[in-house]
Amino acid sequence: MKKLLAGSILLAVLLSVISCNTKKTDGFTIDGTITGADSGWVLLKKREEGKMITADSVQVKEGKFSLTGKVDMPEVYYLKLANVDGAFPFFIENGTLTMKVYADSIDKSTVTGSVSQDALVAYQKDEAVYNHKMEALYGDYTKAKESRDSVAVKIVETAYDSVQNAQSKFTKEYILKNGKSVVSAYLAISNAYAYSLEDLKAINKSMDPSIANSAYVKKLAERETILSKVEPGQPAPEFTLNDTIGKPISLSSLKGKVVLVDFWASWCGPCRAENPNVVAAFKKFNSKGFTVFGVSLDTDKAKWQDAIAKDGLTWTHVSDLIGWDNAAAKQYGVMSIPANFLLDKDGKIIGSSLRGEDLIKKLEEVLGK
């Protein structure tokens, strides 16, 4: 009886210990120290639907703070100090994390205890080689522009593009080789704007089932689905937005013409630089049945209308004036502008990302010279 009682007590103690340990590792604890701020507030933020929200906050006491919570999968959060510019992005995963935060240079902050964060830091260290090269080349580019040396400008631009392409290749190879890491999924969705449908298919195929529940993996799958609906050969998704006087205009109302669905904004420098090329194409081919359907990602109606007038954009323009939340942009998977899609007279997509001479050549192919 005594042995049975002793065994029961021992079992109860062991279960208690296991229970306590489970509670400690069930979620995450962030223990942080701040250099340069003994008081104030720490804000833990995360990105949801393109917007930054505050997930938690805690008061700093004697330069220290502690945050607790739980995540289903490792995920990037942003640590921000109230009334201090900038934020520090880092991977949170369940367990105990230790942070060293520097109030005067928050981007130099560090985190230990997160395997995913360690992997991200290692990647960033290797990627920095390319960033340093591009920074140096940008300095050379600025000097060449100031001295009006067009030959030097061209040489530097070519060199910069070469390094940028090498960086993109490095990142893509990292993603494809590390499919078991949520970091790869995070990097992939962060660079998704630059990936074709074929790229995304390969990346999604490389993702390990063990990280299938990651929000980043799910977003990659959604991205692939969207792009598959707007690739050449597909019927252009229908949408209706208001024009500059508030009248609803549907894309389908232009059926029977070759249409360039052109995503742009008044605040977008590259868009404004490309507008003269679109104007030239419109003037050359409008009489042959070509038109443009301008979709603006503006939020300010006056600035939108002013840009239309200044750039001489004499075609139909629509917008919902909610910036990147633009319904049509989301429908077409637009993550950067300028972006465009060329439709034939039946409303079928026959090209995309056509700029400058490429647009002219494609229109000559479709409508003749």
Segments (PLM) and residue ranges:
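Bacterial Sec-dependent N-terminal signal peptides
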Residues: 1-32, 368-369
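A non-transmembrane, solvent-exposed segment enriched in polar/low-complexity residues
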Residues: 20-169
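N-terminal targeting signals for export/organelle localization
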Residues: 85-87, 97-99, 103, 153, ...
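Thiol/disulfide oxidoreductase modules built on the thioredoxin-like
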Residues: 190, 311-313, 320-368
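N-terminal "domain-start" segment that seeds a small globular fold
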Residues: 218-252, 315-316, 361-369
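Conserved redox-active cysteine motifs that mediate thiol-disulfide chemistry
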Residues: 255-256, 263-280
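Structural microenvironment flanking redox-active thiols in thiol-disulfide oxidoreductases
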Residues: 272-311, 321-330
